[in-house]
Amino acid sequence: MKNLKMASIHDIDWSLWRPVDRATLTFIVKDGEILLIRKKRGLGAGKINGPGGRLESDETTLECAIREVQEELIITPLDLTECGCLYFQFTDDYSIHVTVFRAADFEGQPTETDEAIPLWFKVDEIPYEEMWADDILWLPKMLAGESIGGRFLFSDDRMLDYELE
């Protein structure tokens, strides 16, 4: 894709697009609150997000979602529901396909790890200003029970363009 001059989502031929990585994000919503994390390292370090990460070669997206929540928060999400997929292209040629899950319950006690700090927020007080710029576009839809989907173009952590499905 080597096109550092991408400025619009329409500069990308999505029919040929193949992500560098595949990943998951999981949002646990219980009793009017959402469990988020402050990411300590990796892509999005310092930002607030849902727990998640890259798929390993031998696992499904569901297995990845469970593993990542277990690794980042020392809990096990229960009854995960797939909510949709998000496609991210960065101007430095990195790209990632993210499958988003939602869970209404979990086993264990959310615990800080070397990867993440657990944070609970009321669903109407989500700190979007501390999150990736795209989250405010699709997370409310997911919380309302809608399927989500979208394509996003970023330069570092700045969103240049997007298209929701």
Predicted segments, located by residue:
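Acidic, metal-coordinating catalytic segment for phosphate/diphosphate chemistry
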Residues: 2-25
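A cytosolic small-molecule/anion-sensing beta-strand core signal
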Residues: 30
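A positional/architectural concept
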Residues: 45-47
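Unchanged
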Residues: 55-78, 87-142, 161-165
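Catalytic phosphate/metal-binding cores of nucleic-acid and nucleotide-processing enzymes, i.e., regions
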Residues: 84
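Acidic/histidine-enriched, glycine/proline-rich intrinsically disordered or flexible terminal extensions
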Residues: 148-165
